[in-house]
Amino acid sequence: MVRLTIDGREAIVPEGSTILEAAASLGIKIPTLCYLKGVNEISACRICVVEIDGFERLVPSCTEKAAEGMVVHTNSHRAKTARETNLKLILSQHDGDCTTCVRSQNCHLQDLASELNIIDNPYPRDVRNNEWPANSYLIRKESKCIKCMRCIEVCDKIQTLKVWDVKGSGSRTTVGVRLNRAFTDADCALCGQCITHCPTGALSIRDDTAKVTAALEDPEITTVVQVAPAVRTAWAEHLGLTREEATVGRMAAALRALGFDYVFDTNFTADLTIMEEGSEFIERFTHRDQIGRAHV
């Protein structure tokens, strides 16, 4: 075990623990942005920097290991100033039009700017616009990307599909599809993990809400909605309903009230789905050496 002092409090943590983990064990929150435990630990954003007695420079707490006798200051003037400066530099290259962003009020970067009380930014704006076509399944907006590399790491380490990669160098660094392929040619499974872990609105799914609304308002169109089993749980969580409150009948009634002509539950074909996915897995497993074990 390692014994150290953080903000005047003693912490005892297992050897190999980071300062970030040691602080968390005391209930001390150190702001982070690019960090994803066990997935993305590259200290790229430098938001989690802390001051350590005897260290000339500030260090990123997400990668710096706790050491015996270490004295850490997570909220010193020097650490706070560096943290705010680093965030302002990130914001200077970010499209800050939050009112039209799909992640507004659910954005890690927005929350962090509020937490650190970032009101003005003296740094000149350098925002690059390279938005994907609106008809793509997945939408990427370079103007929102902060180069945290979360999407790259979660796709590599969790999904093992390696769709994303770093492109360019220096100030021109960005994220794109590996090997400069078109997104349609990548091995993307459309799992949504990169969207879920993106801290901004740089990645999102295509929004067809306007098309659905138009179809519901058109008397010449018969509208049908088919609900997957997972949705029955997801909608309840979003609205804060209990399992008893979130009945299938209640959900179907809400969809009918919206104007859908027919509402179906995917349960009635679940057996076919299982057979199809099972057959696909057997095919992939049988030919795993040809297609690569990572894609099984």
Regions found by a protein language model. Give the residues of each.
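Eukaryote-biased recognition of intrinsically disordered, low-complexity regulatory segments
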Residues: 1-9
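Iron-sulfur-associated redox domains of electron-transfer enzymes in respiratory
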Residues: 2, 15-69, 75, 79, ...
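A short N-terminal beta-strand-loop micro-motif at the entrance of redox/enzyme domains
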Residues: 9-15
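Short alpha-helix boundary/capping motifs
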Residues: 13, 145, 188, 245-246
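Short Gly/charged-rich anion-binding patches and loops
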Residues: 18, 108, 150, 193, ...
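Fe-S ferredoxin-like electron-transfer domains
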Residues: 46-190, 196, 203-222
